């Protein structure tokens, strides 16, 4: 998958969900919504290389309920 497309998917996920997302949450959202399988570390490499996106993710170790349980 090309990098620009993956970056746009990450941006879309961050805009769609208002609550804090971790890199793992973002990967699950993209895999579920776009029906793709992402290689290990692909989301992390995108986030670490793009400081604008890295600032938006949750970097704490807080455990949030699964996405399908949360209410918007």
Swiss-Prot record:
Q: What induces it?
A: Expressed in the early phase of the viral replicative cycle.
User: What subcellular locations does the record give?
Assistant: Virion
GO-annotated cellular components: virion component
Q: Which domain of life is it from?
A: Viruses
Swiss-Prot/TrEMBL keywords:
Early protein, Virion
Protein family (similarity comment):
Belongs to the asfivirus I73R family.
- What name does UniProt use for this protein? Uncharacterized protein I73R
Q: Which organism is it from?
A: African swine fever virus (isolate Warthog/Namibia/Wart80/1980) (ASFV)
């Amino acid at each position: 998958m090309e990098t620009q497309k993956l970056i746009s998917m990450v941006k879309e996920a961050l805009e769609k969900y208002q609550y804090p997302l971790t890199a793992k949450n973002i990967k699950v959202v993209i895999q579920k919504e776009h029906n793709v399988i992402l290689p290990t570390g692909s989301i992390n490499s995108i986030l670490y290389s793009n400081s604008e996106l890295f600032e938006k993710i949750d970097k704490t170790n807080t455990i949030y309920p699964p996405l399908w349980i949360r209410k918007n």
